[in-house]
Curated annotation (Swiss-Prot):
Listed Pfam families: THF_DHG_CYH (PF00763), THF_DHG_CYH_C (PF02882)
Gene: folD
Cysteine disulfide partners in this protein: none
This protein's UniProt keywords: Amino-acid biosynthesis, Histidine biosynthesis, Hydrolase, Methionine biosynthesis, Multifunctional enzyme, NADP, One-carbon metabolism, Oxidoreductase, Purine biosynthesis
Protein name, as recorded: Bifunctional protein FolD
EC number(s) from the headed UniProt entry: 1.5.1.5, 3.5.4.9
GO process terms (BP): L-histidine biosynthetic process; methionine biosynthetic process; purine nucleotide biosynthetic process; tetrahydrofolate interconversion
Domain of life: Bacteria
Source organism (scientific name): Borreliella afzelii (strain PKo)
Amino acid sequence: MNTVFNGKDFANKYYLMLKEFLKERNLRNKITLKVVLANDEPASKLYVSIKNRVAKEIGLNVEVIKLSANSVQSDILEVIDRENKNLSTDGIIVQLPLLKGMDLNSILNGIVSSKDVDGLSFVNLGKMILGDKKGFVPCTALAVLKILRDEGIKTSGKTVVVVGRSPLVGRPISILLSSKPHDATVIACHSKSIYLDVYLRQADIIISAVGKPKLIDKSMLCGKPYVIDIGISEIETDAGKILSGDTDFDNIKDCVKFITPVKGGIGPVTVLMLMFNTIKAHLINNNMFDVLDRLEKLVEV
């Protein structure tokens, strides 16, 4: 095994850089992110608390708008509409998953595109496809690009197998990596791909985001690829519940050049890119394009 990625150390380095960036430009505590939480799942509460802590550490204002678990879709849309009109709100995210029966697209597209810092609205996904840099790229996809760049993992001309096709993660990653300047040859697979092992053996880089525990083992690999594991699932063991990625980590770790673990892997970098997008939103909405240029050079993807 060559490298097990340390996402916490990676992200912490950039958190300090963003903190200094905001301080130097007198922007600390002048940028506001609103987080809408409408479920009682422990995992969602944990993710929100992490985003809240990181934002405050670097100097962003965060307000968590907690709705009742009995909330209906119109309650969330009402909050979104209010924050769309709130001039002091720079970014809005809705913590997923939504409650059963809610229309994900209606809620995500309720957020005005200039404040959609998760980058999941139709407008921002369209801008991503067209290469419009004023749009917001989904944070996990952006995190993948950041890891590849900073770790010196070349994509141009390489074969990248992306396992997962969700519009939130897998599909944006496939589109971005096949576009300039990344120029990869992307093979898009999913949990129903019959010949997944055949495709994986062709891969220079594997990116998996399907949420199926231990889907990928060493029998499916060839030539020590780079692996970014985005999937996360709970599995039962004799010792109780544990987290698992899409890869069988212990099984493949000696058969790869690079791998991201489930804990402390892609997660901290995804939060980092949410902070980046939130600062970017403030700068664009206030026509601070010279400062935006410096930000993009600081956190280059």
